[in-house]
Amino acid sequence: MMLTLALPKGRLAEESIDLMISKGWLSSKPDPNSKELIYNDPKGKIRILLVRSQDVATYVEQCAADAGISGWDVLKEGGYDLATPLDLKIGKCRLSLAAPNGFTLEAHHRKIRVATKYPNLAREFFFLKGLSCEIFKLYGSIELAPLVGLSDCIVDLVSTGGTLKANGLKELDIILESSARLVFNRSSLYGKRKEAVEFMDSLSKI
């Protein structure tokens, strides 16, 4: 049986597709100029759904896809009911607390204003620190928020730290180490067990 796999558009999809080609699950890459969001590989092993990164887990959880590849940060933020059997060790980054130079948590005595795309993980971080915070959920350009007075600090993904540095921000703490995870809904993990196990075993040999 064919596996339907949800992939996030962008760099992680490209890395995932390269990995599957190297393992013999795909014969070729989808046409980068195509507007089609479903790719049926000629080998007949995999059908790919190209979706937004935040939507991968929903497609899998609701059985619109058997499996998906998603960042650990997205999975932890959403709290999805999925099997997460494999860390693919690609798409590595970290979710970090960052702020302008001079800001410290210890010296902050009022409610801390935090801008982030990850309100649940940010709230949990400050709760465990015993600090009160006000969360502003943003969808992009998170680094801008403390520069214009919207927030005191940010919680955002960091790869190299170059964007933080360019905007006068420094990394204060790492909240979560993230990488791409292969996820399955439990129905497909049972109903397509042979294909699922073969797929996992193949990708685990990186």
Swiss-Prot record:
E.C. designation(s): 2.4.2.17
- Coiled-coil features, chain-numbered ranges: none
Pfam families from the entry? HisG
Entry annotated with the keyword Lipid metabolism: no
Enzymatic reactions? 1-(5-phospho-beta-D-ribosyl)-ATP + diphosphate = 5-phospho-alpha-D-ribose 1-diphosphate + ATP
Q: In which pathway does it act?
A: Amino-acid biosynthesis; L-histidine biosynthesis; L-histidine from 5-phospho-alpha-D-ribose 1-diphosphate: step 1/9
Indicate where this protein resides in the cell: Cytoplasm
Similarity comment text for this entry: Belongs to the ATP phosphoribosyltransferase family. Short subfamily.
PANTHER family this protein is in?
ATP PHOSPHORIBOSYLTRANSFERASE (PTHR21403:SF8), ATP PHOSPHORIBOSYLTRANSFERASE ATP-PRTASE (PTHR21403)
Q: What does this protein do?
A: Catalyzes the condensation of ATP and 5-phosphoribose 1-diphosphate to form N'-(5'-phosphoribosyl)-ATP (PR-ATP). Has a crucial role in the pathway because the rate of histidine biosynthesis seems to be controlled primarily by regulation of HisG enzymatic activity.
Task: Please describe the quaternary structure of this protein.
Answer: Heteromultimer composed of HisG and HisZ subunits.
Q: Name it.
A: ATP phosphoribosyltransferase
- Origin organism is Leptospira interrogans serogroup Icterohaemorrhagiae serovar copenhageni (strain Fiocruz L1-130)
**What is the taxonomic lineage of the source species?**
Bacteria, Pseudomonadati, Spirochaetota, Spirochaetia, Leptospirales
